[in-house]
């Protein structure tokens, strides 16, 4: 037995001398229950992670990350080719499609490690959410990102915010002068959402001075990114739906051109 382990065992034995078996059993059960609760909230992932700001947001490390050629949604990771070194993984999809990375974070380290980089999870921060929930979702995004970095993955912070009231915490834990990612999904047909996107993006650029922005989705008209390099990626879901619509239209035209014949 390792000497350190043996000394610890002897120490526990001396500590428990004269203690009833019931007290010892209760102590063990309480400790196990406490650890189970801590794991439920992924608190062990905070070990060796620096936190910043009023709400103790996990601080991501600055990494030298090259912009990938393409981005795919996390929901397509399992079906991707084995070698995906020129591709990054994004989470600009519905929360239910990636909630498992929070519930079982260690399970997805190896699959995500096949890709060039991975964006931090984009847990929703809707305007009508309670403030506590928005803070919690930003915290979860940072913590999972910090954990992936500790596991050796190349991680790009995802910018997420709601209204101006969220600006005080939603950019905490993101290193300045680094590469960040942002999505415009859902902003183009909603004037209020587009306005808050503009306000939040301007604030993020002023505060973080990012070196590079990975922009997922159609650009917001006439938005000025200044001297920041912008790498644009198409919304693959929109492209996929357009393709399906074109295929459906082509099939409909073929059906009209070749009507079924009736046999006498």
Predicted regions and their residues:
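Non-catalytic, usually N-terminal nucleic-acid engagement modules in DNA/RNA processing proteins
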Residues: 38-109, 129, 254-262
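C-terminal accessory extensions appended to soluble enzyme cores
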Residues: 1-63, 226-264
């Amino acid at each position: 037995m390792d000497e350190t382990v043996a000394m610890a065992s002897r120490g526990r034995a001396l500590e428990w001398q004269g203690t009833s078996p019931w007290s010892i059993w209760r102590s063990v059960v309480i400790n196990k229950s406490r650890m189970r609760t801590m794991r439920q909230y992924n608190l062990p992932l905070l070990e060796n992670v620096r936190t910043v700001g009023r709400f103790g947001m996990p601080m991501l490390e600055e990494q030298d990350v090259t912009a990938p050629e393409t981005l795919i949604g996390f929901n397509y990771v399992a079906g991707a080719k084995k070698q995906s070194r020129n591709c990054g993984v994004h989470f600009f999809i519905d929360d239910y499609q990636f909630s498992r990375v929070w519930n079982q974070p260690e399970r997805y380290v190896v699959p995500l490690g096949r890709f060039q980089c991975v964006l931090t999870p984009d847990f929703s921060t809707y305007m009508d959410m309670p403030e506590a929930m928005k803070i919690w979702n930003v915290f979860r995004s940072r913590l999972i990102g910090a954990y992936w970095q500790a596991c050796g993955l190349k991680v790009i912070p995802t910018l997420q915010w709601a209204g101006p009231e969220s600006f005080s915490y939603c950019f905490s834990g993101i290193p300045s002068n680094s590469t960040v990612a942002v999505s415009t999904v859902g902003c183009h047909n909603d004037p209020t959402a587009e306005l808050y996107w503009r306000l939040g993006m301007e604030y993020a650029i002023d505060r973080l001075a990012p070196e590079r922005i990975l922009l997922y989705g159609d650009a917001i008209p006439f938005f000025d990114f200044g001297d920041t390099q912008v790498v644009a990626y198409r919304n693959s879901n929109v492209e996929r739906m357009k393709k399906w619509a074109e295929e459906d239209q082509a099939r409909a035209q073929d059906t009209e051109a070749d009507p079924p014949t009736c046999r006498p």
